[in-house]
Amino acid sequence: MFRWGIIFLVIALIAAALGFGGLAGTAAWAAKLVFVVGIVLFLVSLFTGRRRP
C-alpha cells in the first residue's frame, strides 16, 4: 500500500513540475487515499492480528 502511495506521490510531483494541474491533483488525491487506506488496514491488523492459541 505504501509503495503505491509513494508512486502516486512521485507522479503528482512530476506532473506538478511539468504544469499538468489536473493530473497532478488526481495523482496527489490517489496518493492520499492509498496512504489513508494503508494506515487503516495497518491499525485493523494491529488490533485483530494473529493471536496465540
Curated annotation (Swiss-Prot):
Source domain of life is: Bacteria
State whether keyword Acyltransferase applies.
no
* InterPro entries listed in its UniProt record: DUF1328
Keywords of the record, alphabetical order, are: Cell membrane, Membrane, Transmembrane, Transmembrane helix
Name a single GO cellular component: plasma membrane
| Entry's transmembrane regions | 4-24, 27-47
Q: Where in the cell is it found?
A: Cell membrane
Q: According to Swiss-Prot or TrEMBL, what is its membrane topology?
A: Multi-pass membrane protein
Q: Does the keyword Transport apply?
A: no
Family statement drawn from the similarity comment of this UniProt entry: Belongs to the UPF0391 family.
What is the name listed in the Swiss-Prot or TrEMBL entry for this protein? UPF0391 membrane protein Ent638_0536
What organism is the protein native to? Enterobacter sp. (strain 638)
Q: What is the lineage of its organism?
A: Bacteria, Pseudomonadati, Pseudomonadota, Gammaproteobacteria, Enterobacterales
